[in-house]
Amino acid sequence: MSTETELQVAVKTSAKKDSRKKGQDRSEATLIKRFKGEGVRYKAKLIGIDEVSAARGDKLCQDSMMKLKGVVAGARSKGEHKQKIFLTISFGGIKIFDEKTGALQHHHAVHEISYIAKDITDHRAFGYVCGKEGNHRFVAIKTAQAAEPVILDLRDLFQLIYELKQREELEKKAQKDKQCEQAVYQTILEEDVEDPVYQYIVFEAGHEPIRDPETEENIYQVPTSQKKEGVYDVPKSQPVSNGYSFEDFEERFAAATPNRNLPTDFDEIFEATKAVTQLELFGDMSTPPDITSPPTPATPGDAFIPSSSQTLPASADVFSSVPFGTAAVPSGYVAMGAVLPSFWGQQPLVQQQMVMGAQPPVAQVMPGAQPIAWGQPGLFPATQQPWPTVAGQFPPAAFMPTQTVMPLPAAMFQGPLTPLATVPGTSDSTRSSPQTDKPRQKMGKETFKDFQMAQPPPVPSRKPDQPSLTCTSEAFSSYFNKVGVAQDTDDCDDFDISQLNLTPVTSTTPSTNSPPTPAPRQSSPSKSSASHASDPTTDDIFEEGFESPSKSEEQEAPDGSQASSNSDPFGEPSGEPSGDNISPQAGS
């Protein structure tokens, strides 16, 4: 008997522990399962229902509870007992059923219950306030056991419903926001489907963009799956327009010059290419039309592609392929090279070099020889002598009078950067023969038949007997009356005839866009006579054009007198220099 009693006590103890464990498990999933369907069922007795004035209040509930208990005590004296019920707690609320009949007596939804109160005098009694605004009632119930589990279940039910409602509202709000975002994105896609910036916003960075694959350059390019450096790509430049890429040019350049320093060469090529492309900005500054030189390239990349008529060996210099080759230039002509764009900004520095005797690099080309690159010393380097007059004294407007009829082109007044083509000198017998004078006179007449000289600027004179000239119709005749007359060395005469680089068909179109450049003489006292004697045709043409009938007598004179007469821009008609007109070179 004792063993059976011990077994029964052990079973009851384990059942209580299980119920406690079940009561302690109050997770969300467990509570949902607990209150789902019919919910939790409790046995109880209905104390009564009382109307109250407020929806909540502890004192209010206590007063209502004492009032209902007094009513029950009066009924008990009459032999009436409390009604036995069972109540269920679920998501539907609190339902009160009659224990005998099982009929539903009262049903209060969760949202109708506003307050729950526990009786402080009886641990088995509790009550709650339910109803709508203006119709609140207090329901008092006495449970068969302690009322605390029922109160805890009601609290858990309210908390669970509140959390579920809150989560549902958040989900609805998130879904609404998502729908709004989708609507906005849909509007963007419909209106700005071609804009790659909006495409990058809508799609991820690694996705393929919606754009035309034909277009190679876009200001904004969405990165593809293979290229993820950034959203915006810099437009790619295409310097070569004739089918040759920059890689092809680099390979050709490396093959042609294997022993040169590539970074330095590329800088030099870039500067030379700018000089080639800048020629079109300053008017007609290219070579004369009769010289068959390649045209100026349209793009920088075309300058380094050799043409069919100009093939040079691989050992040639870097700039031999640039269209400055003088292989097609006839002997006896002075080649007019391209003026670098940086020369215009360095005019004061060049004038300083002219006065101080500095020697700018001049490329001299011999007949049949390879062209020499810019910046290298010439085959016959010549020192520079100080120019007796100050170059660039008059503004550019002084060379353009009001009535200008086909003046000399400004490109003919080349500065110190003009390369000179030296030709072999002729013998004394050839120069003094009358057979050579006739072709020269004919050539001089044909040369100057198309020229109309412009009126020169006013030349200030220091002599008191000569008045200041003005740009009138008499200035032209007064200017040429000075030919053969000794002038002061300080007179500024920019129309130095010996510096004019002329060809038989030189264009006479005025180059008004190119600024005036100083043209200092680039020969030493020892070299000047040789340089003038090596090119007698040019000097004879000019002097015979200005009424010098006895050139044969000048050519028969010794070399010293010839150097003195040639150094004077406007020689004496008889070929005999005056005392005032002797050049500093001859004097020294």
Curated annotation (Swiss-Prot):
Residues 424-436 have a biased composition (Polar residues). Phosphorylated by FYN on Tyr-198 and Tyr-220 upon reelin induction in embryonic neurons. Also phosphorylated on Ser-524 independently of reelin signaling. Signal peptide: none annotated. The keyword Membrane does not apply. The modification Phosphoserine is found at residue 524. Mainly expressed in brain. InterPro entries: DAB1/2_SBM, Dab_PTB, PH-like_dom_sf, PTB/PI_dom. Residues 15-26 have a biased composition (Basic and acidic residues). One of its GO terms (molecular function) is signaling adaptor activity. Residues 36-189 form the PID domain. Residues 537-546 have a biased composition (Acidic residues). One of its GO terms (cellular component) is cytoplasm. Residues 1-26, 417-443, 451-470, 502-588 are annotated as: Disordered. Pfam families: DAB2_SBM (PF21792), PID (PF00640). One of its GO terms (biological process) is positive regulation of neuron differentiation. PROSITE patterns: PID (PS01179). The modification Phosphotyrosine is found at residues 198, 220, 232. It is found in: Cytoplasm. It is linked to Spinocerebellar ataxia 37: A form of spinocerebellar ataxia, a clinically and genetically heterogeneous group of cerebellar disorders. Patients show progressive incoordination of gait and often poor coordination of hands, speech and eye movements, due to degeneration of the cerebellum with variable involvement of the brainstem and spinal cord. SCA37 is an autosomal dominant form characterized by adult-onset of slowly progressive gait instability, frequent falls, and dysarthria associated with cerebellar atrophy on brain imaging. The PID domain specifically binds to the Asn-Pro-Xaa-Tyr(P) motif found in many tyrosine-phosphorylated proteins. Associates with the SH2 domains of SRC, FYN and ABL. Interacts (phosphorylated on tyrosine residues) with CRK and CRKL (via respective SH2 domain). Interacts with SIAH1, LRP8 and VLDLR. Interacts with LRP1. Interacts with APLP1 (via NPXY motif). Interacts with DAB2IP. Interacts with ZSWIM8. PANTHER family: DISABLED HOMOLOG 1 (PTHR47695:SF4), PID DOMAIN-CONTAINING PROTEIN (PTHR47695). Signaling adapter of the reelin-mediated signaling pathway, which regulates the migration and differentiation of postmitotic neurons during brain development. Mediates intracellular transduction of Reelin signaling following reelin (RELN)-binding to its receptor: acts by docking proteins through its phosphotyrosine residues and PID domain. This is Disabled homolog 1. It comes from Homo sapiens (Human). The gene is DAB1.
